[in-house]
Structures are given as structure tokens and as C-alpha cells.
Amino acid sequence: MTAQLNKVRKAIINGCNPAMISDLLDDLQDKHVLKDYEVEHINKKNNTSRDRCRDMIDSVKKKGEYSSNILLESLVKNHKTLAESLGLHEHAPSPIQEHNEDTIKDKEINSVIPCSAEEFKNIYDSHGDKIYEVREREGRKRLALIICNETFQSMSERRGAKLDLEGMNKLLNELGYQVQQHTNLTKAEMVKAMKEFAAREEHADSDSTFIVLMSHGDKPGVCGTDSKKTENGQYGVTNLLQVDEIFSTFNNVNCSRLWDKPKVIIIQACRGENQGGELVRDDVAPAPLEDDAVHHVQTETDSICFYSSTPDTASWRNPTKGSVFIIRLIEKMNELAHCQPLGDIFLEVQSSFKDKSPNQYSQMPTQERSTMTKKFYLFPGY
């Protein structure tokens, strides 16, 4: 539809009048294609009807196929004479516009399903100011941080970690985030990387962030590459990145540019050695699936943390496929991010771990101490 709108763009501009433009802007605003401030900007910025019309069309085109389709449909339904002169006629919604849920369920989903204009409108109509604001793509600078430790000075290699890194990188890119990626960092280097990321000026032009940590772990924290298991240490491991350090780095004092914006922390690491099953673990002791675990201390406002397992238990990783938690998280995000808030998607991930047979390796991801005050929709494609 963007190509079709581009084809008739000049003719629409030449045939427009003030009343028609006002009608179209009202319709686009009602259907959440254009926001209030965008309509106000179009009206105030332009002195002539032609300029207003040109600005309106170009603003809609930038939003993609769905938005372009809505503008053309509005033109056909409300301004038939002009539409007919342009060769535009009423048509059924395109297959892209309406997701066929049966088709989606019947095949493996390897990429994020985009949010349609209809879904976007329905979500805003249903929830309104109860959802976190999503900034327009133009000028938006979403950032995400991934730290993935695979090799260690005194611990086993986390085989399969590269697959987790590739999968999370792809997922976050498809959700519109520019990923800052680090591998094999010591505890001090992890702290430095987080502080530098928290200080980035681009957060002022963002609407949210993801922080993903994947490593070996123990109950109080996440292992750096220099972590070692001790005989008499309080927690048994040295050089742990304490979970409290993660949250304090991104609180409203230390990361003010992300104030009032969702901050999503995802941790794939063991939190102990108790097993709900057996694969390979990401605790400090070697085990063939491998496990990862960690403990949560404090969260800040508008934050949510999703752990790969409950306290004192292991998290499992397949050396040839990647971590079970990361695999299922990516699957559910690909499938549901277009229509469900993040908290509900996390519940779907948790449900996928429930009621496994005694012969299967078990773990239970947990959402802990969320301080989200609204629903967080990702609206992929917007």
C-alpha cells in the first residue's frame, strides 16, 4: 500500500481541499496512525492546503504498509469522487494486515511477527493511558545491552552460549533496538560496561531498554570470567556481579535518561545447585546440558527482571542448541510481541516449563519485584 500511496501522492495533493484534509487527519488520529502532537504539527507548520496534505501523506508513508492502507481506505470511504478519479476502490484487507492465527500456530516462527495497524488501534482503544508510551520510529534511539560470558579463567566453558548471543541479538534488533554487545568480561569489566551503557545520551530519545546478562552464576550474583569457586566464601564464589549492582546502575539517579521508561533485565545464569532436572548447568561446578542461576536484591521504578530459574536452583543449557530459557523466551517473543504486553509473554514462557515429565530437566523462570506501573507493549514494526 505504500507503493500505491506513493503512486497517487501527487494527484491527492493536487485534488485536496481544507475540509478533506481535516477529515483525513481526524480519521488518522482516531485510528492511532497519527498522534495528537503530529496532527498539531502538520496543521501549524504548513500555511497552505497542499503543504498540509503533502506533510500528512509523507508522515503516514514513513509508518509503513498498514498506515498507508488506512489512509487510502479513509480516502475511498469518505471522498469517493477524488478516490474514483484516482482509480482507487474499496478492497478487502490485505493478508498482511490480518494475522492468520491458525497459520501462525501451524508453523515455526523464526522472526518477530509485526504489529498490524488494527492491533495497534485495538490495544490503544482498550488500554489508553495504561500502557507505556511508544515513541515514533523517526528520531527514536532504542538501545539494548548484552553481556555474554562463554569462557572463564577457572570455570567450565559455557558451550552453546554463542547461540544464545546470536538469538538475543536478532530478537532485539527485530524489536527495534541497537544492541551493544560484550563477551567474556571480568566482574569489573561488566560493571564498567553497564555504567557506560547507562550513561549513553541516546537513552533520552528512547522509550525503553533491555539489559541481558548470560553467564555462570550463584545465588547472589552473576559470574565474571575471573570468578572462582572458594572453599570458605560466604557464597562460595569470588568476583560476582551482585544483582543489586545491576539494578542500582539503572535506577533513576544513575540513569536518569531512562526515568519513567521500561527497563527490562533478563538474566540467564544459575542461582544455586539444586536441580529440578539435569542437562548442563551454568553454576560454578561443571555438569552435559548446562545450567545458569542468580538472586535478585532490589529493583527500581519501571523495571522488570526475568530470571532463568528460581533461587537456589540451576538453569539448563544445551551445548548444541543454547539455553532452554533463552530458546523459549525468543520463541514466545517472536510469536506474541505483536499483541501481548511483556509481562504476559513472560507468563507464557513460565507456563512452557510447567508439568514436565520426571525424565525431563526442569527449571522455572521467575519474574521478581517488578515495579512496572503500566503495561509494556513492544509494538514491533512501529
Swiss-Prot record:
InterPro entries: CARD, Caspase-like_dom_sf, Caspase_cys_AS, Caspase_his_AS, DEATH-like_dom_sf, Pept_C14, Pept_C14_caspase, Pept_C14_p10. Coiled coil: none annotated. The active site is at H216, C270. It catalyses: Strict requirement for an Asp residue at position P1 and has a preferred cleavage sequence of Tyr-Val-Ala-Asp-|-. One of its GO terms (biological process) is regulation of inflammatory response. Thiol protease involved in a variety of inflammatory processes by proteolytically cleaving other proteins, such as the precursors of the inflammatory cytokines interleukin-1 beta (IL1B) and interleukin 18 (IL18) as well as the pyroptosis inducer Gasdermin-D (GSDMD), into active mature peptides. Heterotetramer that consists of two anti-parallel arranged heterodimers, each one formed by a 20 kDa (Caspase-1 subunit p20) and a 10 kDa (Caspase-1 subunit p10) subunit. This is Caspase-1-B. It comes from Xenopus laevis (African clawed frog). The lineage of its organism: Eukaryota, Metazoa, Chordata, Craniata, Vertebrata.
